[in-house]
Amino acid sequence: NLNEKRNQLIQFIWKTNTIPKQLPNLIDTNISDERFSNFSNLKQIDRLTIEMEHGLSSIVYVFSPENHNGNVILYHQGHSGGFINGKSTIQKFLDNGFTVAAFSMPLIGLNNQPIIELENIGEVKFFKHNQFVYLESENFSSMSYFFTPLSITLNYLSTNSSFENFHMVGISGGGWATTVYPSLDTRITK
């Protein structure tokens, strides 16, 4: 049963029966980022800050086009760097009227690399995904770091009634997130 599998996966990732329902911790609207100043059909960039367990945070940029088609693309970059590496892809989506929410993998790009106090070890700076194993417990799965920013960003974007459909694409590790996340959240249609 598909719903049963979805519920099991949600329970495994978040240790609850539902995906996160909250909104971003911080929303900065109409920011300036020189790296994207040459974009065409760009109305504004909003920066979402999503704070998670153990002090990890995720920074998401929402690129809004001047002329939009009512659809949103969640674009997830992979392990090679932040979503700046997908600049040409983001521009292509903007050219076609999509609002683009751009994500980087945890600990990469604009996302932080916190120092976390580990029992019996001490303070450790987290900068690689394989360190997440030290955070696993019966009450916490580090898998949530990969999917919580997607859920919270969708919660925020869903408050805008002008969006008709949510789509998702990704590269490398972002492609993996793109394969898994739509099975958890039926708001993603393609």
Language-model regions: role of each:
Residues E4, Q8, S88, Y145, ...:
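Extracytoplasmic/secreted proteins, especially bacterial periplasmic and envelope-associated proteins
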Residues H76-T148:
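Cap/lid segment of the alpha/beta-hydrolase catalytic domain
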Residues I45, L56-I59, F83-T89, G175-W176:
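Short alpha-helical segments and helix-capping/turn motifs at coil-helix boundaries
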Residues Q8, F12, T16, K92, ...:
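Structured segments of extracytoplasmic/periplasmic soluble domains
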Residues K21-N67:
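N-terminal cap/lid segment of alpha/beta-hydrolase-fold proteins
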Residues S151-K190:
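Primarily recognizes the serine-hydrolase "nucleophile elbow" in alpha/beta-hydrolase
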Residues F63, N71-G78:
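The conserved beta1-alpha1 loop
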Residues N1-L23:
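N-terminal pre-domain segments of enzymes
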